């Protein structure tokens, strides 16, 4: 008798619990379906490292497209489409958009990191990021790193924005040659950016000899942050060995002759350094 009563009570308890859970889930689902968006919360996850994008800018993107989000039912907001919309902005590396039970539409994103700025004589002014994306110059943003000047042969027009590798394997010989040189030049600047000494030392990379014949890349010069020296690196090929040669020169010759021993240093030729006072 007691055992039968216990079983009955257990069944009744589980039945009531199932009814409660079913009602609760239906109520929660209906409530979520009818819940309105009360806030768009934008979080730039790497804002401490760089500030190309602010929450206000993201909200302005939505406003410019006349997206009425606040006051709209959360269930009717296409979060995947919003993610695609945010990712299409050049400075955005990753984006995640989702809703929460507190009535918020959450936008979380990270930014691309520019590693080099081009400001050339032939009218180009843009950034290249660490993941190989070409971005336009931004008025109020500062990138701490070498600026590339001179006359640089590019595989694209001055207003291009997008991935650099779009030009890889281009069948047009001139485009492919310019792309190959640009990649080598960017890799050189990345190397400088990754080395504490050279990053502090080199402030400008100047491209010269852009009229080099077929099969030859332009020469490059580097300008130190301090002093009046100009250093001819020559071809960008073999830059690690050339910089090692320059460092050895500074450690030995400059130690005896002084920093201003020469105004022009030429590293272009193998196994020698040519200096002009």
Roles of regions detected by a PLM:
Residues 1-44, 64-73, 77-88, 93-277:
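Charged, solvent-exposed interaction patches on well-folded alpha/beta domains
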Residues 48-49:
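Extracytoplasmic "Venus flytrap"
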Residues 54-63:
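An acidic helix/loop motif centered on a single conserved Asp/Glu
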